[in-house]
């Protein structure tokens, strides 16, 4: 099955938000990767970079892990996407 890209050519809609919250929390790619591992989610730092750049998809449990690491809700990561859909 071919991966779908959004209008900007990205494979996900949360990469910019993940970068925003990672930087807001002063987390390196490695530190975020280590934090995700504490929740049993094995994402290499290069994969986090690829997610932020829209080069990799994000599965549901990864999205939940990112939200837990940033102490936010999944909705905080995806709400801008839904706002765009409703325009």
Protein language model regions, located:
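Short, basic-rich loop-to-helix N-cap that marks the start of a DNA-contacting helix
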Residues: 53-67
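A short, Lys/Arg-rich alpha-helix, primarily the initiator
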Residues: 1-25
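Short, charged recognition helix plus adjacent turn
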Residues: 2-8, 68, 75-87
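Conserved hydrophobic/aromatic packing and binding residues within compact polymer-binding modules
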Residues: 18, 32-33, 48-51, 77
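Recognition helix of helix-turn-helix/homeodomain-like DNA-binding domains
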Residues: 37-57, 80
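Residue-level signal for the short linker/turn that defines the boundary of a DNA-recognition helix
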Residues: 13-16, 26-27, 43, 58-61
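Short basic helix-loop element that most often maps to the first helix and adjoining turn
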Residues: 16-38, 65
């Amino acid at each position: 099955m071919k991966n779908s890209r959004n209008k900007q050519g990205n494979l996900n809609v949360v990469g910019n938000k993940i970068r925003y919250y990672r930087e807001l929390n002063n987390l390196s790619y490695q530190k975020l990767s280590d934090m995700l591992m504490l929740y049993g989610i094995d994402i290499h730092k290069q994969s986090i970079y690829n997610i932020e750049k829209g080069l990799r998809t994000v599965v549901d449990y990864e999205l939940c892990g990112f939200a837990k690491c940033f102490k936010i809700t999944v909705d905080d990561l995806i709400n801008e996407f839904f706002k765009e859909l409703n325009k």
